[in-house]
A protein has these predicted regions:
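Charge-rich, low-complexity N-terminal segments
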Residues: 1-42
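Protein-protein interaction regions
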Residues: 14, 23-26, 49, 57, ...
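Short, well-structured hydrophobic secondary-structure segments
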Residues: 27-66, 70-71
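Short, surface-exposed coil-to-beta transition loops
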Residues: 30-31, 74-76, 98
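Short beta-strand segments
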Residues: 56-58, 88, 97-101
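Short, surface-exposed linear segments at secondary-structure transitions and domain or protein termini
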Residues: 65-76, 108-115
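Mixed-charge, glycine-accented linear interaction segment located at domain edges/termini
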Residues: 94-140
Length: 140
């Protein structure tokens, strides 16, 4: 798939995934989450939870997301773990608390497979423009 950014075409993967947010004691609210990956940022996956005041964007490690399909993974504000029913739990923490989400593991596995077609796991470092990174770092 191709992403459009500022009118220019950029190689990348962007898919919509249904996720469910724990909204109360035992009720779940469906969210339409856009999962995006760009080879220019090969270690990161972007989860976009929509626009407006209630919207949020999280950048997750692609490696952590993949590991969370197989077993508990994550540290700090992000934790991911598979469930016995074929879903994946994602806990995102921040100053306002923790959001607990669930989504079908198959949807995330297909998304990650598409990212691996663009940048195979383990080859991410070869996609980084290190000169540009150093230049940006030194200009801070």
């Amino acid at each position: 798939m191709r992403l459009r950014e500022g009118g220019a075409r950029v190689d990348g993967v962007c898919v919509r995934v249904a996720m469910y947010l724990l909204d109360g004691v035992a009720s779940w609210r469906e969210l339409d989450v856009e999962c995006c990956y760009r080879p220019e940022d090969p270690y990161a996956v972007r989860l976009d939870f929509g626009a407006g005041e209630q919207g949020a964007v999280w950048l997750l490690s692609r490696e952590t997301l993949a590991a969370g399909l197989r077993g508990p993974a994550g540290d700090g504000d992000v934790h991911i773990a598979p469930s016995e029913g074929g879903d994946v739990f994602i806990a995102l923490g921040g100053g306002a608390g923790v959001a607990l989400l669930t989504t079908p593991a198959g949807a995330l596995a297909r998304f990650l497979a598409a990212t691996d077609e663009l940048v195979p796991a383990g080859t991410e470092a070869s996609r980084i423009n290190w000169d540009r990174c150093i230049q940006e770092f030194l200009s801070i």
